[in-house]
Amino acid sequence: YASLRGIAAARNYDWKIPPEDYEHKDNYGLFETFEMSNVKPENLGFVDGQNVQENDHCFIPEFLTECPDNSNLEGYFQTEKYFEKIADQIHEDFTFKKGYLEPCKEYIESLDKPPIFLHVRQSDNIGREQYHPILPVSFFDECLKEFPDDTPCFVFTDDLEWCKSQDYFKQDRFLFNENVERYQYRTIDGLGKMQNTLLPQVDLCLMSLCSGAIIANSSFSWWGAWLQNNRGKVIAPDPKKWFGSAMTHLDTSDIVPDRWIIKEWSK
């Protein structure tokens, strides 16, 4: 959505996103989660035009200067370079609905000090490390040295049981959101284990209200950090290792914004 908006603004085009119906789940929950105040009825629908694909993950400046009108964008577009010039509009759209924002904000403000967060993406990548490597605990330990020792730290994860079993995360500074609901449908992880995926809205809202971040190689925590709007220091894993050995053909050099800190890691 953000990159679509950025490209449309650069080309002075109208734009559309799919509406919610029985085939399209509310555009991945955008309207369920965010205010989306810049989306008008005329922005909902489909374009009967050519497909224009981004295949390699890197920033392609020609999208901002040459993208033809009446096009459907396909790809990840996972870099803020497509929408950095309209970042204020994206932040406005991605304002959380009050039902999420108010209780999360109340909780954050109840803490003695502004927290940071770290994101452990674990369970859905087990057995798939050749595509999505799992960051070791040592990576988070090294990153936390960039923050004062008494800074509270939320641990957001898709594997709460594993994190809480690790001695490292038993330190008093770590906080967990343990009341996360799950989707009704189930997905399968790399080891064939079926599970109900966690609902993301509350965790993402809490991430956005923190004052610093240690993200995983994940677009979820990438957005959690970006939505902080430069409120604190953001540390990211080396983008060259964002994906595993089976995906070395992808150019990930533009995923991490220049103002964020990059940390190396190894198993």
Residue ranges with predicted function:
Residues 148-250:
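Donor-binding and catalytic core of enzymes assembling or modifying cell-surface/extracellular glycoconjugates
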Residues 1-20, 24:
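N-terminal pre-catalytic "stem/leader" segment of glycosyltransferase-like enzymes
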Residues 17-19, 119-121, 154-157, 236:
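Short beta-strand segments
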Residues 243-267:
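Leloir-type glycosyltransferase catalytic cores
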